Amino acid sequence: MSEKETPSPVLDVKKEKNEETGIDEEKSSEDDCSKRSKVKSNPSKFSVNSILSPLESLVRVQQQLLKMAASKSGTPGTNAGVPGAFPYGPGRLPGNYFAGPFPGYSGAQPNWYNGNDPRFAAAAALLPCSIDPVRSAINHQFSMSSMSQRRKRRVLFSQAQVYELERRFKQAKYLTAPEREQLANSIRLTPTQVKIWFQNHRYKCKRQEKEKAMSGLGHSEDGSSPPPDNDDDDDKYSIEMDDKDDEEEEESEKPVLKPSGVFGLPYPPNAAAAAAAAAAAFNFPFAAQGPNPAYYMRW
């Protein structure tokens, strides 16, 4: 009897193992539950709820203010029927929402279509001008006013001014800044107007030369001459330019140094003449001698 009552050590080890595994399983299930609760309690920062949560709090504050204003104004509650069946009843809205035929719909519409919801105001502030009609209209009006201010106007020259300008143009087609200022003061014009007249007149002369060349070819082939181009009226007008346009014209008239093909550096003026004079002064002997045919016959 004593031998049967003694428990076997193998069974005790199994029980301990089973008990240990059971405890481990319970612990693992508790850990899983805690992890899931942590995941639920810590949502992603980039989720829709986390982004809209501050805006929703503002909406709640605004709704409370609206309710307080409605209670102070003394609007009676006329929401008949089951309470809470329709949240947008006339009893829960301010007095200015009762103008429409359907009070509930008129109250819901401004809340969803750019009404008192601050989310729509924040989104409208971030919209570009092409989407926001108010901002686009303001910018369009501002751009039109700036364009009207920069619109160039034509200045009519007198016959005496045109005569003096043509006489000076025959002497020199290009004027320096002091000469231009002196001529402008003598005929009561601005230096910019004188400069523009000279530019227009140079362009007119070049165009007339091209037309004469083309008309000469056409007259020799067909025997008929094209109608003459009367550009005398162009000299009577000048377009007044702004200071910015004047600076651009001065920069365009400056000589441009083209880079060389060796080191990419620009050639100085009169570089070719200086190089030829230096070569002639040294008089290299190998440059004057021609090729020797005997040198090539050896090969």
From Swiss-Prot:
* GO cellular component annotations of the record: nucleus
The Gene Ontology biological process annotation of the record reads:
cell differentiation; nervous system development; regulation of transcription by RNA polymerase II; regulation of transcription elongation by RNA polymerase II
Q: Where are the annotated segments for Disordered?
A: 1-45, 208-263
Basic and acidic residues compositional bias: what residue ranges? 1-35
User: SUPFAM superfamilies of this UniProt entry?
Assistant: Homeodomain-like
The superkingdom listed in its UniProt entry is Eukaryota
Q: Which UniProt keywords apply?
A: Developmental protein, DNA-binding, Homeobox, Neurogenesis, Nucleus, Transcription, Transcription regulation
Subcellular location per the Swiss-Prot or TrEMBL entry? Nucleus
SMART domains under this entry?
HOX
Q: Which Pfam families match?
A: Homeodomain
Q: Which GO terms describe its molecular function?
A: DNA-binding transcription factor activity, RNA polymerase II-specific; RNA polymerase II cis-regulatory region sequence-specific DNA binding
Q: Which residues bind DNA?
A: 150-209
Q: Which InterPro entries match?
A: HD, HD_metazoa, Homeobox_CS, Homeobox_NK-like, Homeodomain-like_sf
Q: In which tissues is it expressed?
A: Expressed in the 8 vulval muscles, 8-10 ventral neurons in the head and in the most posterior pharyngeal muscle cell, m8. Expressed in SIA, SIB and SMB sublateral motor neurons, and in muscles of the pharynx and vulva.
Here the segments flagged for biased composition (Acidic residues) are 242-252
The record's note on what follows loss of this gene reads: Normal growth, coordination, egg-laying, mating, chemotaxis, pharyngeal pumping and VC neuron synapses as in wild-type animals. Abnormal sleep behavior with mutant larvae displaying a reduced, if not absent, type of turning behavior called 'flipping'. Irregular formation and extension of sublateral motor neuron processes.
Read off the CDD domains from this record.
Answer: homeodomain
The record's listing under PROSITE patterns reads: HOMEOBOX_1, HOMEOBOX_2
What this protein is reported to do is described as: Probable transcriptional regulator that is required in neural development for the normal formation of sublateral cholinergic motor neuron processes. Plays a role in regulating the expression of acetylcholine transporter protein unc-17 in the sublateral processes. In particular, it is required in sublateral motor neurons for a left-right turning behavior that occurs during the lethargus phase of the normal sleep process called 'flipping'. During 'flipping' animals rotate 180 degrees about their longitudinal axis.
By sequence similarity, the record places it as follows:
Belongs to the NK-2 homeobox family.
Q: What is this protein called?
A: Homeobox protein ceh-24
Source organism per UniProt: Caenorhabditis elegans
The gene designation is: ceh-24
